[in-house]
């Protein structure tokens, strides 16, 4: 299968199974589109009919182009066969290790964001803070179930984890004290709204955290529409200076300033540009996922605007890189030469199998977006996973699990998509969140184009 599209002056041909990317002229673009359904003679006739007025488009040139396409096909770089389906099933069945935990150290928050999927940090339950004892047991559980894997990921999440920062510090200290003995290397991520970041916190995060995720929706009026405290006051004026201090002192370590866009700001590229103009260079912006009846939910009529926004963003990134003002966008970080292995491309994030979320009480869920939904509770950190039926559902989530995905050119980029988004949109982790699919495919098209432009 190949996917062909035109963007920013490039004629792009993407081979689905091999991942090969080709940029071609108009004639070759049309020949590739005809190649599988027409004989060489038919292709020559149709191409001459369309391009025969051009001096360099002759029968011999067309036949030579067909030969080149055939050579690429034989080399597995065009119309290549997908031989990966069995790998998906075998890998998930054989993989029994846990590589990462999302520790919900705070089921409470100091912001009252109305679009929050976690019900202002409560996850449809009670407010709570994780104790050191539960967190310590979670780290031990991760080590016990990680097999021979050395690098382990731990995300400090909420709610707002800064409301339980002393426990965060003690857990990091504990992990560092045992990682040598256990032959493990912990990499910590910390997600914060930035409201109560102190210099002491920043110093600790910069020392210990491999990555920090900083929540900001962009322009002040956009951010302060949803991201408000319990008195209704916007957060922008508080968090932007805090984030600047953190990033400026981070010394090149990883971070993301991450926002959410809604129906209210479908011109979200302006929010990304605003964040870049503030001096932030590692950026992400996610579409809101919420019930379709919500006033801020994205609607079908928004799609053409959103597609255009992603294209505008890619072009702006090319422009700024040439000007010496580059920034990165998470969804455009596509490595065409040294990307993830085929197993990762097939199986995705590993939620429910290699990755789990831990509540303040030690309950296990497939990921943070399932926390509070009792039917998706997997077990707990004290007794382990006992809901193997649900875990097996997640083992089957891959690029080939859904019939709709089998004929999709983007399946080896999305790995079957986000199980949580599918569940919230369709009621099943085996469903297809079609709106999200359309956005994802547009992002991949832009990301590939961006790679082509930057490698010219």
Q: In which residue ranges do the predicted regions lie?
A:
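Conserved alpha-helical substructure of the radical SAM core
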Residues: 56-72, 76-203, 207-208
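Acidic, low-complexity/disordered tracts enriched in E/D and polar residues
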Residues: 1-35
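Short acidic, hydrophobic short linear motifs in intrinsically disordered regions
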Residues: 38-52
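C-terminal accessory region of radical SAM enzymes
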Residues: 304-338, 368-415
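Radical SAM enzyme [4Fe-4S]-AdoMet core and its adjacent flexible, acidic
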Residues: 225-237, 244, 248-352, 377
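Radical SAM/AdoMet-radical enzyme domain recognition
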Residues: 135, 139-155, 164-288
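Short Fe-S-cluster ligation motifs
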Residues: 139-157, 394-396, 431-456
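Cysteine-cluster motifs in flexible loop/terminal segments that predominantly coordinate metals
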Residues: 395-446
């Amino acid at each position: 299968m190949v996917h062909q599209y035109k963007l920013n002056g490039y004629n792009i041909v993407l081979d689905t199974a091999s991942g090969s990317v080709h940029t071609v002229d108009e004639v070759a673009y049309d020949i590739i589109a005809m190649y599988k359904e027409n004989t060489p003679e038919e292709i020559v006739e149709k191409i001459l009919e369309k391009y025969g007025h051009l001096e360099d488009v002759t029968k011999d040139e067309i036949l030579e182009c067909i030969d080149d396409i055939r050579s690429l096909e034989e080399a597995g770089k065009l119309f290549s066969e997908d031989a990966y389906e069995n790998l998906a099933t075998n890998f998930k069945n054989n993989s029994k290790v846990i590589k990462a935990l999302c520790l919900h150290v705070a089921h409470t928050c100091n912001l009252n964001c109305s679009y929050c999927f976690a019900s202002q940090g409560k996850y449809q339950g009670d407010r709570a803070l994780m104790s050191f004892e539960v967190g310590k047991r979670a780290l031990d559980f991760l080590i016990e179930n990680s097999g021979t894997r050395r690098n382990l990921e731990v995300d400090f999440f909420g709610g707002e984890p800064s409301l339980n920062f002393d426990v965060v510090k003690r857990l990091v200290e504990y992990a560092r004290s045992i990682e040598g003995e256990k032959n493990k290397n912990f990499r910590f991520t910390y997600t914060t709204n930035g409201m109560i970041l102190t210099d002491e916190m920043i110093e600790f995060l910069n020392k210990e955290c491999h990555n920090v995720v900083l929540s900001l929706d962009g322009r002040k009026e956009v951010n302060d529409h949803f991201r408000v405290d319990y008195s209704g006051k916007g957060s922008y004026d508080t968090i932007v200076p805090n984030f600047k201090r953190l990033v400026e002192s981070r010394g090149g370590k990883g971070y993301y300033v991450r926002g959410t866009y809604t129906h209210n700001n479908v011109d979200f590229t302006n929010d990304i540009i605003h964040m870049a103009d503030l001096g932030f260079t590692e950026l992400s912006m996610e579409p809101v996922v919420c019930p379709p009846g919500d006033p801020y939910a994205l609607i079908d009529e928004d799609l053409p605007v959103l597609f255009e926004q992603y294209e505008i963003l890619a072009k702006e990134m090319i422009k700024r890189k040439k000007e010496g003002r580059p920034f990165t966008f998470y969804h455009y970080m596509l490595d065409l030469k040294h990307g993830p292995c085929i197993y990762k491309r097939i199986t995705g994030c590993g939620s429910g199998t290699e990755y789990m979320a831990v509540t303040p009480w030690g309950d296990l869920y497939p990921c943070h977006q399932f926390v509070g939904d009792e039917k998706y509770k997997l077990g707990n950190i004290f007794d382990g996973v006992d809901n193997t039926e649900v875990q097996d559902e997640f083992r089957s989530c891959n690029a080939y699990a859904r019939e709709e995905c089998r004929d999709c050119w983007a399946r080896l980029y999305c790995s079957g998509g986000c199980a949580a988004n599918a569940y919230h949109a369709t009621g099943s982790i085996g469903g297809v969140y079609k709106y999200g699919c359309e956005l994802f495919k547009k992002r991949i098209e832009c990301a590939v184009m961006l790679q082509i432009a930057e490698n010219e």
